[in-house]
Amino acid sequence: MLILVGSKVIRVGGSFVKSNGQCNCLVRLFAAQIPSPPVAESQFQNEWDKALPYEKIPGPSRLTLIKDSLPGGKLATLNLGEVLEQYRHQYGNIYKISGGFGTPDTLFVFDPKDFETIYRTEGIWPFRPVLETVEHYRKKVRPDTFYSGGLGVEQGKEWAEFRTTVNPIMMQPKFVKLYIPQIDQFVDEFIIRMRKIRDSNIYELPENFEEEMDRWSLGATCLVALDSRLEIFGELDKNSREYELTAALKRFIYLRSVLDLKPSMWKVFPTADFKEMMRVLDVITDFSFHHVNEAKKRLESKVNTKSEKEQSVFEKLIRINPKTAVIMATDMFTAGVDTTSSAAISVLYNLAKNPDKQEILRNELRKILPEKGSPLTQQNMSNLPYLRASIKESLRVLPVVNGNSRKTGKDLVLKGYRIPKGTLVLLQSLYTQVDEKLYTGGKKFMPERWLKNQESELSKEARKVSPFTFLPFGFGPRMCIGRRLAELEIEVFVSKLVRNFYIEWDQPDLKFKTVGINVPDGKLQFKVKDVEN
């Protein structure tokens, strides 16, 4: 296939990729995601003519949804994930919630074949809905700080230009792996903290352990986002920047769900929640800006003796533009801390519920960590198939998000209905990735299905399933920019904890709720008993 990029023609799927310098990174990023050859125009027109009109797609109105969600309504006691599942049973694998109150229609799809169709036709500048409060803050309240809305706000050409700038830095495993020693040491400190806060008689962690997990994730993120080591465990001075940041991030998660994920009047007049959100974003932004300025002074005061490959992610970003570093830091705080924490919790929970799998992983880790305090390195982390299979399986069974979202890049026909270009679609993979028809023991935690060097029926089956069934970090040009960092943080965290502790769960099954992402809905009372050696 030949496509035009800038002023030059390039071959995709062949042996070369060429373009001018500005677009070259974008070409490399998008080349592997170029859609399959399109259906012949006449064939598509025939499908379109036979399809039912968009208006015939079943589903509730926005007003009905609001009414049913009020106290006493049939949806009042359900979380968002349960509501979507109930509608799926009622309407099938495609339905829409009609727009209203300034919001567009939202189409929900549940079939991996439809996921693939949408992704394959999204174009090189995919449109993904943004948090409008964050967009308002960056473009209306603090445009002096944010020369760009960043990856979480921008669309089209502006998004592509910013992604082109940061992608070679954020998505390169070799750059992220430079942080293994620092993250390893930080997890060692967290293990000391866990031993201190657990019950000395029954080895049970406190009910608020989720807050400790959030602090671990925040601290690990700061190592990369700001080249800063936070003293974040234990009691924090309420006047400290660290305390203000942790409090702000906690409120951000709540306010995001109230203002951006539910109907709100903030666009009509500034509600109390909206005003608080602006203050919260000020705290997060000012924290990032402070550390960027401090780092800039440090870099300017000393001769740079590091080669490019030795420079940290943060150093690379700040040398491009200090404001770019601020944008990426705030994005990592608002989009990465809670998701990484929740993902790590789900891995611990699945391993605790499956002690036989936990022991297999521990035996794998003993080979590279002969002592409980042995450090992780780039070299000894290079071959840990069961660790990575365990993390992947946990993200399948207990995903951090219900799916992904896009606006359709062209007119489509899905499930016999006409879907106009520009329709907002939510791709609900939460249900397909545990479907018993696709995965044997779909809801069971079985990491063996992802071991590439095995020829078990489980692994053979997993290889046959469409990859669009399960995409925990998204797909294509708008794939999660923090994927490499999140994977590394979780790998180091799980490795060190499993090598040090027998992780147990003797409570009722842990439930999760949807607040934009899926988070634990209950107390995290893990038991952690020391491994002898």
Where is each model-derived feature located?
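N-terminal membrane-proximal hinge/A-helix region immediately C-terminal to the signal-anchor transmembrane segment
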Residues: R11-G14, C23-L26, F30-D144, K157, ...
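Cytochrome P450 catalytic-domain helical core, especially the substrate-recognition surface
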Residues: E55-E85, E132-L226, S240-K297, K323-V326, ...
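Conserved cytochrome P450 catalytic core segment spanning the I/J/K helices
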Residues: T64, M171, E276-A344, T377-N380, ...
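Conserved cytochrome P450 K-helix E-x-x-R motif and the immediately C-terminal K′/meander segment
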Residues: L70-Y95, D286, S374-K415, T423, ...
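Cytochrome P450 heme-thiolate "Cys pocket" and heme-binding signature region
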Residues: G149, N453-I490
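Central I-helix of cytochrome P450 enzymes
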Residues: S217, T221, V280-F289, E315-E364, ...
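Cytochrome P450 heme-binding "Cys pocket" and the immediately downstream C-terminal segment
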Residues: P355-K357, R483-V519
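Conserved cytochrome P450 K-helix/beta-meander segment immediately N-terminal to the heme-binding cysteine loop
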Residues: L427-K460
